[in-house]
Amino acid sequence: MNFTLLATEGFGLNFNLFETNILNWAVVIFGLYKFLPSFLGKMLQKRREGILLELKDAEDRLLNATQALEKAKKDLSSAEEKASQIKADSLKRSESIRMESEKKAIEEMARIKQSAISDESSEASRAISQLRKEAIELAIKKALDSLPNRLDQTKQENLVTQSINNIEEN
């Protein structure tokens, strides 16, 4: 390299304070050092307080959510217990209703059977009564048909007299 070129071009330090802006930089740095901490400190303090407040609020919400979750779990277990109790009760009730229905059906079938037997015996009794009535009517008709041939005048008078005497005695 060419060192003579460097020496002639003026490479070096400039100690003129006004040309180098060292005073300007010193004022700016001093101002920043003096005023920035209070201004920035207030902003940072407000931001810190805001963050702490938000953290406390988040912790409170977490606590409330945890408590609500615990309550919901208790309510759920209580509801499940109640549902299983209701299910067991309904099964018992349906079983008793089924048994009662079966009992009523059996009783109704027995009543219908008894009624049928009763109807059958009353029908038989009615048929027997009808047959007796027809037999009596037929016997009376036969007797009346054969009576004029078998009775003469004196026998008829004796029969009438005897019937009148029987009526008077009673």
From Swiss-Prot:
InterPro entries documented for this protein: ATP_synth_b/b'su_bac/chlpt
Gene Ontology MF: a single term: proton-transporting ATP synthase activity, rotational mechanism
Record's keyword terms, sorted: ATP synthesis, CF(0), Hydrogen ion transport, Ion transport, Membrane, Thylakoid, Transmembrane, Transmembrane helix, Transport
A GO cellular component annotation in the UniProt record: plasma membrane-derived thylakoid membrane
Record flagged with keyword Transmembrane helix: yes
Chief location category: membrane
Subcellular location, record wording: Cellular thylakoid membrane
Membrane-protein topology: Single-pass membrane protein
Signal peptide extent: none
CDD domains reported in the protein's UniProt record: ATP-synt_Fo_b (cd06503)
Ranges that cross the membrane: 15-37
Disordered: region residues: 72-98
Pfam families from the UniProt entry: ATP-synt_B
HAMAP family: ATP_synth_b_bprime
Subunit: F-type ATPases have 2 components, F(1) - the catalytic core - and F(0) - the membrane proton channel. F(1) has five subunits: alpha(3), beta(3), gamma(1), delta(1), epsilon(1). F(0) has four main subunits: a(1), b(1), b'(1) and c(10-14). The alpha and beta chains form an alternating ring which encloses part of the gamma chain. F(1) is attached to F(0) by a central stalk formed by the gamma and epsilon chains, while a peripheral stalk is formed by the delta, b and b' chains.
Function, as annotated: F(1)F(0) ATP synthase produces ATP from ADP in the presence of a proton or sodium gradient. F-type ATPases consist of two structural domains, F(1) containing the extramembraneous catalytic core and F(0) containing the membrane proton channel, linked together by a central stalk and a peripheral stalk. During catalysis, ATP synthesis in the catalytic domain of F(1) is coupled via a rotary mechanism of the central stalk subunits to proton translocation. Component of the F(0) channel, it forms part of the peripheral stalk, linking F(1) to F(0).
Family the UniProt entry places it in: Belongs to the ATPase B chain family.
Protein name, entry field: ATP synthase subunit b
Naturally occurring in which organism (per UniProt): Prochlorococcus marinus (strain MIT 9215)
